[in-house]
Amino acid sequence: MGMSMGKIKIDALIDNTYKTIEDKAVIYLYLINSILKDRDFKPYFYVELHKEKVENEDIEKIKEFLLKNDLLKFVENIEVVKKIILRKEKEVIKIIATHPQKVPKLRKIKECEIVKEIYEHDIPFAKRYLIDNEIIPMTYWDFENKKPVSIEIPKLKSVAFDMEVYNRDTEPNPERDPILMASFWDENGGKVITYKEFNHPNIEVVKNEKELIKKIIETLKEYDVIYTYNGDNFDFPYLKARAKIYGIDINLGKDGEELKIKRGGMEYRSYIPGRVHIDLYPISRRLLKLTKYTLEDVVYNLFGIEKLKIPHTKIVDYWANNDKTLIEYSLQDAKYTYKIGKYFFPLEVMFSRIVNQTPFEITRMSSGQMVEYLLMKRAFKENMIVPNKPDEEEYRRRVLTTYEGGYVKEPEKGMFEDIISMDFRCHPKGTKVVVKGKGIVNIEDVKEGNYVLGIDGWQKVKKVWKYEYEGELINVNGLKCTPNHKIPLRYKIKHKKINKNDYLVRDIYAKSLLTKFKGEGKLILCKDFETIGNYEKYINDMDEDFILKSELIGILLAEGHLLRRDIEYFDSSRGKKRISHQYRVEITVNEDEKDFIEKIKYIFKKLFNYELYVRRKKGTKAITLGCAKKDIYLKIEEILKNKEKYLPNAILRGFFEGDGYVNTVRRAVVVNQGTNNYDKIKFIASLLDRLGIKYSFYTYSYEERGKKLKRYVIEIFSKGDLIKFSILISFISRRKNNLLNEIIRQKTLYKIGDYGFYDLDDVCVSLESYKGEVYDLTLEGRPYYFANGILTHNSLYPSIIISYNISPDTLDCECCKDVSEKILGHWFCKKKEGLIPKTLRNLIERRINIKRRMKKMAEIGEINEEYNLLDYEQKSLKILANSILPDEYLTIIEEDGIKVVKIGEYIDDLMRKHKDKIKFSGISEILETKNLKTFSFDKITKKCEIKKVKALIRHPYFGKAYKIKLRSGRTIKVTRGHSLFKYENGKIVEVKGDDVRFGDLIVVPKKLTCVDKEVVINIPKRLINADEEEIKDLVITKHKDKAFFVKLKKTLEDIENNKLKVIFDDCILYLKELGLIDYNIIKKINKVDIKILDEEKFKAYKKYFDTVIEHGNFKKGRCNIQYIKIKDYIANIPDKEFEDCEIGAYSGKINALLKLDEKLAKFLGFFVTRGRLKKQKLKGETVYEISVYKSLPEYQKEIAETFKEVFGAGSMVKDKVTMDNKIVYLVLKYIFKCGDKDKKHIPEELFLASESVIKSFLDGFLKAKKNSHKGTSTFMAKDEKYLNQLMILFNLVGIPTRFTPVKNKGYKLTLNPKYGTVKDLMLDEVKEIEAFEYSGYVYDLSVEDNENFLVNNIYAHNSVYGYLAFPRARFYSRECAEIVTYLGRKYILETVKEAEKFGFKVLYIDTDGFYAIWKEKISKEELIKKAMEFVEYINSKLPGTMELEFEGYFKRGIFVTKKRYALIDENGRVTVKGLEFVRRDWSNIAKITQRRVLEALLVEGSIEKAKKIIQDVIKDLREKKIKKEDLIIYTQLTKDPKEYKTTAPHVEIAKKLMREGKRIKVGDIIGYIIVKGTKSISERAKLPEEVDIDDIDVNYYIDNQILPPVLRIMEAVGVSKNELKKEGAQLTLDKFFK
């Protein structure tokens, strides 16, 4: 550390930064009592070369590159050092920069040809300093001996600070609204500083706001730590803005530095150099699990205190009335901010020490970022280079790669006593299974890595379990298993709303079949168990050459040719003609089919000892593998002649690999053949028949270039037949097999009895005794396999990482490849401890030692400050230790228009068209794009933006999905992990499908950004694909005289021949303007140098021009040419060519380039609404009628005038405006796609136009839409896509919309719904959430910058999991993450099994904890003894540092569902996880009832008492014995009452108060009581002072207030809703204790 210590010996570092002094970066270390400066620490980064050793010449090349790019001046020194990059040590170059701000410029060095990669160039300089140096922040540090001297938290002066500002009807504006007061609270109490007198003892009055600001600065400078609640984003930015108005600098820094407001991601960061500003809002969000994070909510949840609340909009009233309540409110803000700060501060200090970064940075880091800096510190100590953050392409690849998550046991529902908690640190011999390549074998002979016959085909065996067992076996139809083994049964669903043919598959304990089974379930059998087993044995014994010849037959039938030609040639040596007999065997495949190519090469090498030649077709990915040997040709010809004698399975494998594919949309295997291949397809069908694989055979006819053709299609669709295909045939390539396996997994088992692969049988059960070994298998994929032909079931993280040495730098090392255990195909180094395991081991050992010290201290009663500090540290150590469904409408911006498309169809179609460009990542498919854009929004500015779509993505998914319906009628279907955006506490935050809740305010667009493009339609180009009958008499007129055509023809010929004899200036200038050529005039030699810019376009233009010259009709300075003559060339002709052209029939032409201006837009508005196209014969002539029908008389004249302005014609006839013009008819039909009365369509070009053009369209649209029966604020249509288009158009001009399905009528679009808005966004409330199971493709977009896009007019996002699996992590490893979760599942399952064998009944287990009871009633002491014995036993079986630890004894507990339970220990401490607490907007009676019910169940163990509490409350309510105050419901206004389209109780009360002259604003909390009556709930809401207790609606309060908070808990212990209302049978307590 290059700095002078002076007299400093012991002090504590609280902050660090750097400053630029005399162009040099100086590190500032802010201690409690002084400031240290380090001028010697320099910024640096590493450069890796393509070679292992760095030579002097390499340094010179680096210097030369830097000098050439004017960068060498930014380099202070260049060194060669040795560093470890992942697993390998090598020489790298260390570039030391002159200043941190020069490092980004020096990154250009990556472009140097000898450079492979650059590292550590993006680590902030001040953070880099703390990584490289030993000093630990927030610790009393001995600077002389460089070590900590105490664990005590440094004594720092701390204060909480809060401001109140003038708040008008909207959000406060610092340009306009003053600061009214500031409150402060420290260890001695608090005060409020203001410039107005109030009657309050804790007030200090200054002269005005300017003096108030000065006083705030003066006060804050007295403290080391400043607590705020949302100070980053509100208090400090507002203070700085107001200070600027008065010319005051906010010099709050310890060395007089100014307050710095920085942007950090989505938020601001208010930084005070040398002081610790702790914003408690992000900490609360990180550490607490709440529904809302207001200061009031956090105070209540942490301390049970209800602080004083004043709505922000009421502050002005309190201020005006000098109401001292405002002072008390402000003071409480500071007081409770201080209290929260003191609560969290010790934990944040421990994070700061462990991660080695300052508390300002730590409090703004996510857990993942903390882990990253911890690993970077460890990497520095280990001399390892820190990996780079991923670029966008790598990030998307990581995001798209998924794996199976951790294991959670579904809990035993009910109430239990004497629970112990622990925390993580089968079939007999002779059972038959089918093993791939072996046939039917005994289960004891199965090896790990074998593939056995499972529910979805071949499934890999990950683990074979073997136990000694003595006891009873259950014999189920000949399959013997232990009593706790699970057998899946198929049940018919009995529900009137469910299809009678639907079924479900449930796992049943074998022992349950003896007692509970009633005969309705069916065993699931494999019909072909023995056949498949025999086939596998047969294949295993078969000669390989025979199989290869069979595969070759299939390959040649699909992709091969046998070519024999006799070529005559003259043999000059013999002086006569001779015949050459040529023999060739050729197979053509795509170069990307690597597995297929390797197989073909292997077959020829193995059978004929021949290396195939390879020939590539120019400009394509097609390659031909060939053989020109006569003897090989004849052998293959003989094999093909006898193809019926070969193995059908292998023939089909070769054929389907070549010509077949997996249709992932229909989930089928498909192969098709053309007209001439009927015999071939019938042969393939016959082979499938021989194997018993069912298929569908289709023939469809079509016409191509005048020829009538046919295609023959075979499709294998059913799950059973797909499984048989995968088992008996399969594909050659891994990619196709992966897709096949995926579609099999997606297929349901609902109709399992109908599948050929499966069979069903009634259950027959018996019991027998057994002593000996029992076995079970753990499989990849679904946990089911066939044993004796019957389907059967098979039976932490930090510790796992350490035990297996899991780390990216130990993954798949070469040194341990042959000795390390293989897990999911990977292994980890045994010789060197990895970076992540070492870091975790240190953390865990540190935590274990701390907990031991704490335990000893607790035993002797030393629960003091040191104990509390240790507790904070161990807690901090513990803390450190998905997509859219296909039918949703995506809004996409293409070059020629904005399209509203179904996301699945759109992405599927593009992937079909560009299948050669698809990239694969696991089972995900990625298609990168260049010219697509979409609507997005910036989360900070809340403004809509148009962003580039970088890639389209799809991948198979099976699991839970949600249909989320919003108040506006918008709906979206998302997977459980896909994120939307919600508005919460003034911020926009992401919310996953799993976490969306009723009432959330979801972000949708109010205003979309216009593309604002001048849209010009090239009519000739856009009519290329029109019906030739309709365009055959079209003519293009070009306004140029013949002389120009002659000169241009000559110029084109001369340029083509590169002999420009005569230069026509106007011609070469014209060709340059068309973008076909460029030229340079060389005056000295009087020469023009011409360069053709695009050969293909130039040739197309010349062909087009030659055709015009040949067929054109020249007269009167223009040329007429039949459109049909030049149609084939037009696609490549520049638009400018048609600037002086018209197009149409001989009568009635319009400009060939049609500008979409305001007049045309208005015409389209009229036409889309009420327009019709009609083609009819009148007097032998074809009439092309364009009409607008049934408009109101006041608009009919305007419509007629618009017709004439745009197209020069149009007349009013009765109830319509009409014209006859063929070219206009064609433009409307083929380009704008309008005029079909049954299918309305808005021209896509319109979406690209300016806002004024869109407004003109909407003006015409609304006028045409309006009639005597309807207004213009609501539109009905049956076509969802059409209304989606219309919704976007209105959003483009800033008009918000509501989209509502209407039963049996389609959809309704409403304009200007009165919803809350934030800039370009509208806030739409969640009204319905429907969960469902989905299997199939899901889709996503990668969008530049914002990573969000518009689906169903809702903004959607995507999300990630875990640090190792976090796609933006530096130390990312999907393989490591997958292995960690796999091993977690494995050891949890092992522990459950061992616990059950030991005598425990496991109630619930996941990666967080283990809860169990003893199977029989025993004493507490005996139970704890058993638990300790089991801990010792299981820890001897668990690997390495992975341990089960006895956590405690619980007197009683209630288990509801996964992750939802409540427990009480001996001392009355209650642990609650996941159970829904009452919401703020429930009445007090709801809160009281829930609390009393939990007390009755947990403290007393009395279900009857809990039930009676609820029943008594209901009884008291019916008898009106409840206090009226306990029935008041409080609900917050989320927008102006006038903006609510539909009403609600609190809205009606608010409107009533406003009518009475009361001031009501957004955010106000309204109290009301519901009274009885027949009107709606909203109309029956009354102010509490208006209500007598006899008026209340008893049933409303029972069903909506009392029961909801307790019903889930009571149902878990077996009490129904009817019983609670005294409407059902009574239950006894004994029934529920297990």
Curated annotation (Swiss-Prot):
This is DNA polymerase. Residues 552-693, 1163-1295 form the DOD-type homing endonuclease domain. InterPro entries: DNA-dir_DNA_pol_B (IPR006172), DNA-dir_DNA_pol_B_CS (IPR017964), DNA-dir_DNA_pol_B_exonuc (IPR006133), DNA-dir_DNA_pol_B_multi_dom (IPR006134), DNA/RNA_pol_sf (IPR043502), DNA_pol_B_thumb (IPR042087), DNA_pol_palm_dom_sf (IPR023211), DNA_pol_type-B (IPR050240). It is an enzyme of class 2 (transferase). GO terms for biological process: DNA-templated DNA replication; intein-mediated protein splicing. NCBIfam families: intein_Cterm, intein_Nterm, pol2. Gene3D superfamilies: DNA polymerase family B, C-terminal domain (1.10.132.60), DNA Polymerase, chain B, domain 1 (3.30.342.10), Hedgehog/Intein (Hint) domain (2.170.16.10), Helix hairpin bin (1.10.287.690), Homing endonucleases (3.10.28.10), Intein homing endonuclease, domain IV (1.10.10.1010), Palm domain of DNA polymerase (3.90.1600.10), Ribonuclease H-like superfamily/Ribonuclease H (3.30.420.10). This protein undergoes a protein self splicing that involves a post-translational excision of the intervening region (intein) followed by peptide ligation. The gene is pol. SUPFAM superfamilies: DNA/RNA polymerases (SSF56672), Hedgehog/intein (Hint) domain (SSF51294), Homing endonucleases (SSF55608), Ribonuclease H-like (SSF53098). Its EC number is 2.7.7.7. Pfam families: DNA_pol_B, DNA_pol_B_exo1, Intein_splicing, LAGLIDADG_3, PI-TkoII_IV. Belongs to the DNA polymerase type-B family. The lineage of its organism: Archaea, Methanobacteriati, Methanobacteriota, Methanomada group, Methanococci. It comes from Methanocaldococcus jannaschii (strain ATCC 43067 / DSM 2661 / JAL-1 / JCM 10045 / NBRC 100440) (Methanococcus jannaschii). One of its GO terms (molecular function) is DNA binding. It catalyses: DNA(n) + a 2'-deoxyribonucleoside 5'-triphosphate = DNA(n+1) + diphosphate. Keywords: Autocatalytic cleavage, DNA replication, DNA-binding, DNA-directed DNA polymerase, Nucleotidyltransferase, Protein splicing, Repeat, Transferase.
